Amino acid sequence: MSDIENPAGDTRPIGVFDSGLGGLTVARAIATALPHESVYYFGDTKRCPYGTRTEDEVRSFALQAGRWLSKHDVKIMVIACNTATAAALRLAQQVLDVPVIGVIAPGARAAINSTRTRRVGVLATNLTIRSGAYTRAIQDLDAGVDVYGCPASSFVEVVEHELASGAHLQEQWLENEDIFDTPAVRALVGATVEPLRDHGIVALHRQLDAHYAA
């Protein structure tokens, strides 16, 4: 959570916004890294998933969430939704009266740090892929990394909302494995990452690494 500044003496809460419940993993990470902070969470479960929404709709939803969090006097807003980060981060930073950060930049840094072949595959919602947000974020940090985007809204929806068993999630993953026809060893899933650990995707990552390293 190095992207969150913590001014001394500012006891206001940190606001976290997501399209559903997946962002609770981000809230937990903040609580672990900054145990003395309070966190307010806004999960838009009524209108999720965002991956099938238009960009204008997602922007509107993000601003509504931001204004709600502002009314609760948060000192910073974390957009814990990749789709909302891609569609609305810049607008929210311009319009809202609190600092706003998203999750794409940290995800891009993690992808660069973990790839051994300088090739990254991105599985994300159609809107996130169309925005080019991950490609820009990764190549702004390292222009030598090749980025392969794969729209996979159904897979991301399963991941973010933990709607399936491990077997179902692996099936969804394999349905989208065409992206690995290119040697994109490290897959960056445009969704909250922690739930993946419970569904065997980490093991799939290791298999991919071993395959392309061979």
Predicted features along the sequence, with ranges:
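Non-catalytic structural scaffold of enzyme domains
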Residues: M1-A214
